A protein has these predicted regions:
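C-terminal-biased regions
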Residues: 1-104
């Protein structure tokens, strides 16, 4: 399923692969379950958004390229569900400012 996901939605595939790499297969499996359980694209995107929001603390543990993929997936979620856009924008801004402050 991971390889198929990488072809179908590369950014989400990147996030799933990285979660497995950092030994968080449980969260990767939740994302795959959201894909499998959705009968419509809205259900799939909504389920993925819920999983990523519930586990947003993992964002600090992933690589920069994967963080960019995570942001791209969340951008897709926010396009589908615009109510969360402002919240996600603020979260991304906070992360960027935090990373800049931590970079020597």
């Amino acid at each position: 399923m991971d390889a198929e996901l990488q072809r179908w939605w590369p950014d989400l595939g990147t996030v799933v692969a990285e979660l497995r790499r950092i030994d968080r297969s449980d969260v990767a499996d939740l994302l795959l379950d959201a894909v499998r359980a959705g009968a419509t694209s809205s259900e799939i995107i909504g389920g993925i958004g819920i999983v990523l929001r519930d586990h947003r603390g993992l964002y600090t543990q992933i690589s920069r390229p994967t963080a960019a993929a995570w942001d791209a997936v969340m951008a897709d979620v926010n396009r589908a569900y615009p109510v969360g856009r402002l919240s996600h924008w603020f979260t991304r801004l906070t992360r960027r400012l935090t990373r800049r402050a931590q970079t020597p």
